[in-house]
Amino acid sequence: QVINFDELTTLIGNNSSGKTAALVALNTIFSENSGDRNLERSDFFLPKDKDPEELEEQSLYVEAVFHFNELQKEQGSTTYSIPTFFDSFVVDAPGHAPYLRIRLEATWEKSSNIEGSIESKVYYFTCPELEEITDEKKRIASRHDLNRIRMIYVPAVRDPSKQLKNASGSMMYQIMNSINWKDTTKESVKGIIQDLNDEFLKESGISILKDAIHDEWEEYHSDSRYSNAQLRFNSTNIDSAIKKAEVVFSPTVVEREYSIDEMGDGLRSLFYISMVDSMLDVENKIREEIESGEELSFSKTPPILTIVAVEEPENHIAPHLLGKLIGKLRDISKKCNSQTILTSHSPAIVKRISPEELRYF
């Protein structure tokens, strides 16, 4: 099956018609999370008239074809996106715009393992789509290069807290960890944090607790290594401090700020999509700095394209907010570095989508 994607594309159809399978297939190639890229036995198609026990081997492939609008329109900057994939471009004929073919190929074989053995590789295909594929036209695609195309997949059953916390691997952590901190800022923050720790330790109760921890540890541990146990309230370097950064909300019905964990499912889902939008804005600014040769605020090299795939955005969202949500998802799709894919069963969503942007499964 071939699916054509626009800037914003909405997949509709019955339950179990393949909408999620299409998104998971793309996620298997372009997810930043290595766990999402693992294939399972159930990913391979089982023909209706076949007994699974009779099968010795199966294969599958998923191919993604990318066109570069800046080349087709002969406008806009080409310095950022083109060099990464230049050697892998395909041109059908003289005067035609080049495009990129990326294909995941996988095989399953029966083995002593109860699930069988699965091998998969991702290739660049350097021949036109209508030509026969030969080994000479296949090149292994490195994960380093594939990371220039990223997919953010938001499933229908979602736990936004995992991404909203500044945990290792989250969007916010990746951005904050790549900030080019000035040396003077690092030293200043280190001094302020040390002063804060010293202020805590001036309290008699804290001092009693600190001494008890230190003295009892000496009784339990006789080795010179790790012998000095000290109570510390804040990390003494900026890298450790930013790991504890989080977004808080105010005003609230009580006299304190709320963390994301205290918000309802609907607000958490909305804020998660808002965070994706924010990170794409930041990455656009990073891209502008790189292309203009300015002093870089970040060491991160952002992806060329981010595919934002949201299943059933209507989940947990009040009906009167759906119009605004679809409007924001459409805004994301219009950014130069992103594309949006939705799935939905909701008439309130579908009526806000142009017929040309619908794909029926």
Task: Show the residue positions of the predicted features.
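Switch/communication elements of ASCE P-loop NTPase nucleotide-binding domains
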Residues: 1-31, 242, 250-361
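Non-catalytic alpha-helical coupling and interface elements of nucleotide-dependent molecular machines
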Residues: 17, 27-35, 69-71, 109, ...
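Short glycine-/polar-rich loops that comprise or flank the Walker A/P-loop
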Residues: 58-62, 98-102, 147-151, 304-305, ...
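Glycine-rich phosphate-binding loops of NTPases
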Residues: 34-57, 70-194, 207, 257
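Beta-strand secondary-structure signal
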Residues: 2, 61-65, 101-105, 246-248
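Extreme N-terminal "head/tail" segments of very large remodeling/mechanoenzyme assemblies
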Residues: 1-15, 23-70
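Extended helical coiled-coil dimerization/tether regions that scaffold
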Residues: 160-169, 173-308
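Solvent-exposed residues in well-ordered beta-strands and their adjoining turns
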Residues: 6, 65-69, 107, 157, ...
